[in-house]
């Protein structure tokens, strides 16, 4: 008689069989392709519910079929076990905000609006469809709940009295009125020509759905923040005889009733809570203090370090809580007990979640390491959720438990699990004058030690920004193609203090160019880069520094210069940087030598021999198209290999998905043509190089 196997034996056999089958069915990892651009899910804006059981957040994706970006609101349970998509309309939804009583989740959307203007919507947690709450002609740009959940403060732009009715079928046939300009700064990217319409605060009564203007006048009012007792709103405004001529933002207070007069709280001659600096106003839980981010003196423009500050709400002296640390700080938020302040601390190649006692003292890096912490939220019970990205993981939402990060969302896990991503290595080296410079090197996934690879130097924009330990699709794409990517943070970058950033003051294309060239020298010396197959490229200031670099070094066989300028004289009055130009360079007629000095890539275009691809959006008011046109024309006149690609309807940021893909494909096509030519002599078009 045969002996039957035991239940344990059967279970073990079945487990082994399942494991074998699982292993045999596990797909082999592949390198990243251009098609994966549309698969990345961009997670942002975590918001913890008042009771702490849920975290709302947004997910942005690219819809290649409809050729648009979509943003929808999701929610994850605090333990991370459940993830729910809350909105799924054909239009986007952003800015989820819980009402303090937990009954509603408000958000912004242009749903059903012919002009695609954002309005305020409410979703009742008890169930039912979201409802549109406002129908304001100027739309809603921002909002914040009152502590009692009965009102909301809105940021609303004055409507354009000359704007055509979106429902008018003949609006395209009507002649537009002339544009009349009388402002000092009269252009801004994504907005266009600036008129005298402003953004104002409105009070919305939730019961009556009536919105009334709280701050009429000739100034913009931004970043509203309610006092804990609901009696006062703090906001930021730039006032004075001609606000366009400085970045001197100040904090004001106003009672929450129509016709109340605003009272100025800060008087620092620089930016208090600059709206362009990921800042906001944060009342202490007891209502006695307001935390914010203070910039440097106005004359330092964007080179100044931004510091965490606290001021008494009743008025008084501002205190800088971490002035001993020469680093940028953003996103101030009080702890639930008011004893300390959380903020994001930018450091060398990373951004960390930090905390400092409200009375001042030592800074604690609550979440550190080789990562980039982004937006975060602390709810009234002290629960904290934050965004975190690493070089091999796009941003996801994490919870902070006992000072340890715990992951809540896994929006990109399925994609990342399929990919053979390149490791990102931190590097440090010396520039020509001995200055220590930091950066990254990215090697192909199947990199072989001892073999030299075609190498591309990528340069970041800014200039006061940095390459950091976050996920860069572009780096992974180039590495997957077989390139080594070298990315440096030259002088002018952020992350290493004000003096390091200001080292290029009125001296663009000199020290910073030497620093990025030293990165290439490092890669060659390490036996990684093939010195005969070098490429370079960047966008915005990265494109500018590309032009500076190829105008003084002929080693590069291919360059991609995006949204760049070389003839700085051409920027005066044609882009949005008039205030910064005059602060740093003076005026062209009072200091022509300074302007000529930084315009040398155009004035000495004959020194450029590198085949160069120029790219730009035709509606870019940040670094307008005319600058790319000039450089293209100069190189074309000299008989150099060059090409100009113009993206219709695009601003400084290329947002249309098919254009995003096209740009990356053209990078690959251009670099391949000169750095990895095929045996048949064909260069490869974007279509042929799309994977």
Predicted regions and their residues:
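Conserved beta-propeller blade repeats
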Residues: 41-56, 90-108, 129-130, 135-152, ...
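Predominantly five- to eight-bladed beta-propeller fold
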Residues: 69-71, 157-204, 248-250, 305-308, ...
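Short loop/turn segments that connect beta-strands within beta-propeller blades
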Residues: 77-81, 124-128, 205-209, 255-259, ...
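Cap/lid segment of the alpha/beta-hydrolase catalytic domain
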Residues: 165, 241, 298, 403, ...
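Active-site-proximal cap/loop segments of hydrolase catalytic domains
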Residues: 472, 487-691
